[in-house]
Amino acid sequence: MTSKIAQNLKQPALDFLSFVNASPTPFHAVQSAKELLSKAGFQEIKEKDSWSSTCRPGGKYYLTRNSSTIVAFAIGKKWKPGNPISMIGAHTDSPVLRIKPVSNKRGEGFVQVGVETYGGGIWHTWFDRDLGVAGRAMVRTGDGSIVQKLVKIDRPILRIPTLAIHLDRQETFAFNKETQLFPIAGLVAAELNRTADSTATGEKTAANNETEKGDFAPLKSVTERHHPYLVELIAAEAGVKPDDILDFEMILFDTQKSCLGGLLEEFVFSPRLDNLNSSFCATVGLIDSVADASALDDEPSIRLIALFDHEEIGSRTAQGADSNVLPAIIRRLSVLPSSTSGNEDLATAFEETLSTSFLLSADMAHAVHPNYAAKYENDHRPEINKGPVIKINANARYATNSPGIVLLQEVARKAAEDGGEGVPLQLFVVRNDSSCGSTIGPMLSAALGARTLDLGNPQLSMHSIRETGGTYDVGHSIRLFTSFFKHYSNTSKTIFVD
């Protein structure tokens, strides 16, 4: 393999590194996706507005909910009400430590920050890491309106230190998540000196900048609930004054950047592979499928991606996959008029669209681990850089079935028509004596009644603060998703079930 070819094959992974490094939270991930979509000519619309005069065949659009879930779609120029929608679903969240509503803690001379666990993280991997803070802050502007500001303190201000081995000889690393998972942020003495110096010089800090009006406050101020200096850092990142911050949602993240690794840079070492890897590939796959100016000219379908928040905690929120986000959007899209609209029957357009649509539920899969090979079923051991993994479970923990597998094989084969080679695929089932995870596929297939298949790129160390994936699998998924969008309309007509 020449260096030029190798570099081209690695480029999608390098682009992913930029995406994931810029996206420590779902809010940032949605912002990163918006930037990619806007650059590709997608127009932002609002869920609260009417789309009847906005969305037209040939158009490309995106919308957000809670700024942590994003849906983007491109409408074929030959669209008619009741036609199919080819969909890819993924999620923007990952297991993290989130700052508690009241986080101001001190212990044994240390300034500490109270955090709570979000999702099922491998929490021992968060010890002894250089942690920054990111999220969104709600701030009051000069005209009195309240807006959100994204914050990313991209330097190590927090750390959760482990106990020295000399003080704990246990073979297993056990700890209490409520009492022993609090990061240190500094020393009390240093904080007191900083506050004293600021007061002596007449500077206002967040601690002594309380309101002078004596207004009733339903809650304690942000600077009372959190360390004043932390609030000052958040305010500085948001470009506002500390007393303009009304509340915030902040998480911790590893400040070590994602990178390529391995002897031949065949690995991606990164946080949040689960599931920003799938979110990135879905976004780029949609963009690439409409990159040609004539891409939608003969397209009778809508091409759509939905990147949901809160998958790691069950999806049962207003912006989760188990909400009305996707059904509501599909209902509105199903009745959009065609470019030659006439007397179209819209009464059953929604049901017609669902019955002919298809959803790829894209969430990361487990690659075989060389040190724990016995944990995997003998004949189903996905390998890194061998392509996306089709996930199957007899008890419907995944939504995959045979018609979907046949469709995906055709899509993977047709990827060669767009240049390059076809996309390799793998199969995965868990052992009978092992529990099986799940994702958004089953809940969406049940809610929509649409055909669904679960798949994802293989990775190691899922839910660790730092995970391992394949460099070339990023490109594999992008090409598969691009081919899915390009060829679904014609391919689906050749597979008969109902």
Curated annotation (Swiss-Prot):
Keyword set includes Metal-binding: yes
Catalytic activities: Release of an N-terminal aspartate or glutamate from a peptide, with a preference for aspartate
GO biological process: proteolysis
Temperature remarks: Optimum temperature is 50 degrees Celsius.
Cofactor note: Binds 2 Zn(2+) ions per subunit.
InterPro entries assigned: Peptidase_M18 (IPR001948), Peptidase_M18_dom2 (IPR023358)
Protein residues bound to Zn(2+) 1: H91, D274, D363
Binding site for Zn(2+) 2: D274, E312, H463
Entry keywords, A to Z: Aminopeptidase, Hydrolase, Metal-binding, Metalloprotease, Protease, Zinc
pH-dependence of activity, as noted: Optimum pH is 7.5.
Cofactor dependence: Zn(2+)
EC number: 3.4.11.21
Activity-regulation annotation: Inhibited by zinc. Stimulated by calcium and bacitracin.
Positions annotated to bind substrate: H166, E311, D363, H366, K391, Y398
Top-level taxon in the UniProt lineage: Eukaryota
Reported modifications of this chain: The N-terminus is blocked.
GO cellular component terms, A-Z: fungal-type vacuole
Molecular function GO labels: metalloaminopeptidase activity; zinc ion binding
Quaternary structure and partners: Tetrahedron-shaped homododecamer built from six homodimers.
Recorded family membership: Belongs to the peptidase M18 family.
PANTHER family: ASPARTYL AMINOPEPTIDASE
Name of the molecule in the record: Aspartyl aminopeptidase
